[in-house]
Amino acid sequence: MVGQGITTVVTGNCGFSATGYDPKGKYVDTIGSDSFALDSKHAIPDFKKWIEYLDHHTPLNVATYIGHGSVRSSINGLTKKEMTKEDYQKMLDLLEYALQNGAVGISVGLMYRPGIFVDKEELYDLGKLCKKYNKTMAFHARANSAVSMGYKSLLGRPHLLRAIDEIVDIGKTTGCKIQNSHLIFVGTKSWKCVDESLKLLHSLNDEGIPTAFDMYSYPLGASTITVILPKWYQRLPLQKRNRFFVKLRLSIEIFITKKLLGFDFDDIQIAYVQ
């Protein structure tokens, strides 16, 4: 990478980091399972020690977020199961420890498990932590398209704009710095949302809340198959997903979504299967 002129990398995006989680958590093996495979046997879960390791093993500058999804899933798994007060506080403590020891902020992946199940109050708590340490809260938004599986209603305000509304609300409520990772417009039906998306994000800067976004430098993106699956389906245990009426409902929803999205399976290339 250095030979190409790359001197700095930013990692830990979209709610997932390779460190900072609870190594004794019951669900360590679920970390990143929708997006990547974490080898917990060779990982360094302590955020401070991980940073110290990097200082001596790479010529690159590395800026990393602490992934809310990694920490949360190590403690509570990938399901919608409500966290106990003790587990919730443990999650906040681990996130705060990372912020105290070099994390540039907290990243959330609201399109991925467990982020899709997180309510507004939890997001406010994350924003308050970032504000406390003058760090950034980075969002993989709930939707990057006009319609998505992130919201129940397929009609009305485009889902992409609803997702940015949520980000703006958290910024205004907590006052933390905001990074929208990534501002993309999936499907031709979403292209009409460009101007309003920019206006919404600029409104935070106008109110004195530092806000930025990044974009892909190429006309494609990489994600996981779960982003086209609705939340109600992902909540189901595996043994119920093959039931006839479950598959029928899923097929109907995906068919309607494709028509409204301007995006189809022909636009998807499967890179690998775990």
Give names to the regions the model predicted.
Residues 1-105, 134-135, 209:
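Divalent-metal coordination cores built from histidine and acidic residues
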Residues 3, 48, 85-96, 100, ...:
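Amphipathic, non-transmembrane alpha-helical secondary structure
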Residues 10-11, 108, 146, 220:
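Generic hydrophobic alpha-helical membrane-span motif
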Residues 16-20, 145, 219-221:
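Short gly/pro/ser/thr-enriched loop/turn and capping motifs at secondary-structure boundaries
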Residues 23-28, 32, 79, 121-124, ...:
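Short low-complexity, flexible loop/linker segments enriched in glycine and/or proline
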Residues 39, 115, 156, 189-190:
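Glycine- and other small-residue-rich loops at beta-strand/loop junctions that grip anionic moieties
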Residues 54, 58-75, 82-85, 94-112, ...:
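Active-site neighborhoods of metal-dependent hydrolases
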Residues 104-163:
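Divalent metal-binding pocket/active-site signature
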